[in-house]
Amino acid sequence: QRNTEYIEQTHAVSLIEKVVNGHRKRPLVLTADRGRGKSSALGIACAQLLQHKPLRILLTAPSINAVEPVYQHAQRLLTDAKQMKKDRLEVGYGYIQFIAPDELLSSLPECDLLLVDEAAAIPVPMLKQITEHYHRLVFSSTIHGYEGCGRGFTLKFIEWLQQQRPGMKTYHMQQPIRWSVDDKLETWLYDAFILNAELSPQSIEGMANVSLNKVDKQALVHQPNLLRECFALLVNAHYQTSPNDLLHLLRDDNSSVYLAMDKQNIIGVILTVEEGGLDDELIEAVQLGQRRPKGHLTPITIINQLGLVKVGKLITSRVMRIAVHPDLQGSGIGKRMLTLLEESVGAHVDYLSTSFGATDELIQFWQQAGYQSIRLGTMRDAASGCYSLLMVRQLANKSQTWIDDTQALFHEFLSASLSLVYPKLEPSLARSLLRQPIQHQTLHPTKRVLLQSYAQGGASYESIFVWLQQWLRQHGLGPVSDLMISKVFLNHDWGICAKQFGLSGRKQVEQQLRSELEKLLSQFTV
């Protein structure tokens, strides 16, 4: 590696090693364009560290496929390494172990070094939790291409990290390894697939001039600058935006593109797909699990998982993507775009829907736009690490009574199934989804007396937790702590709760629960 083309990579390797050998709480943020040797730098650093001592190295990323090059480069240099499984490489008593972000935060395993690859694709709240629990950390991310940084990582997280960890280091790798310097083929590839789509700075004077226009997709092909700006917004906002999305965007007759404009400037984009309108025969086949027609995610889920067969005949416009220029995020433009979309969809559309990887921020955004949760997927998405949430919205001129009924059933199902189906759900997500009180439920007076007794040191947790769960759901989980949700709804073990919240054991956990319950009982008098 004496060649000059490896100078930056060699420096990156030394910075990674310094995270282990230097002071604690001085994380490294490593960024690079595609083909700059970022993943190989991680692998080389792991190998060189393991050659000197048996370290416990944990590697997390949105999916294990994203970190395969790290293992390959480490194994190339470690001749005595044993690949135990796809996710584990052992060298003597040391190892490199992959762990999914959600599992990392639920089990909090000890390690000597934690590498967080493609960090931009991991929700910012999870990155903050990782920072608080682990003190020898490397965050790495691509900043161009479809794995590229969203502004949430580059702005929100890195700014927060600089405040929390003043000794942090950042290093950006620019030197090409996969390509020659100024390689014409790389330039062509980036242009062809809009891999380097950049956004120009934007500002607006107010909402009055914001409009939403459905665009002719063929016109996009003939206006490359318009297409580039539209796609730049999508790449910036969504980690999973890929070349296939570009083709889908241009070819699919059922999908539509809406551009939010302020005067002549593009400030946002919405992609929708029309679904539903299924016939009786197909609906029955979907209900029985015999058919799953492509392009009908919302009606298939509602028919097969929720049992509402008649909804399959209705037409929905599902929002696949919504992106707002990062300079303008948080100013209400996204909500305004969704309001304008309701006015723009065809008269034949019966309701709106959306499905996305659930985070607190996104749930709050869609709830504020009037969308209601009706189904939470049972498996985390491999790329985002999030559960998929299906939400629907009534149109002003088309009442859909089934939506309120379905949301009530969703709340009932979720609160009863959290510990069985979603034991690793983040407590904050449970709070976001079960925030609304159940007005028609009241607690039997005897149950309340028991809760009062427990709050003051009597009864036992095992004798009251069912009534506690009922009472908390009655009032909604808005004011309920993460600890209370973890124990009462997710049924986490006492030891896990203690470890997660920095307490010594069951006794301290119960003290916290009793104290919080006493405050909540005085806050809610029924």
Q: What spans do the regions from the language model cover?
A:
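Terminal substrate-recognition subdomain of acyl/acetyltransferases
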Residues: 1-3, 75, 81-94, 99-107, ...
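N-terminal pre-P-loop "Q-motif" helix
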Residues: 2-26
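P-loop (Walker A) phosphate-binding loop of NTP-binding proteins
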Residues: 8, 33, 62
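Pre-Walker A (Motif I) flank of P-loop NTPase domains
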Residues: 23-29, 55, 255-256
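Walker A/P-loop nucleotide-binding motif
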Residues: 27-40
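Conserved acetyl-CoA-binding loop-helix of GNAT-fold acetyltransferases
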Residues: 40-44, 321-344
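Conserved RecA-like ASCE P-loop NTPase motor core of nucleic-acid helicases/translocases
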Residues: 55-71
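Conserved beta-hairpin
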Residues: 254-272, 280
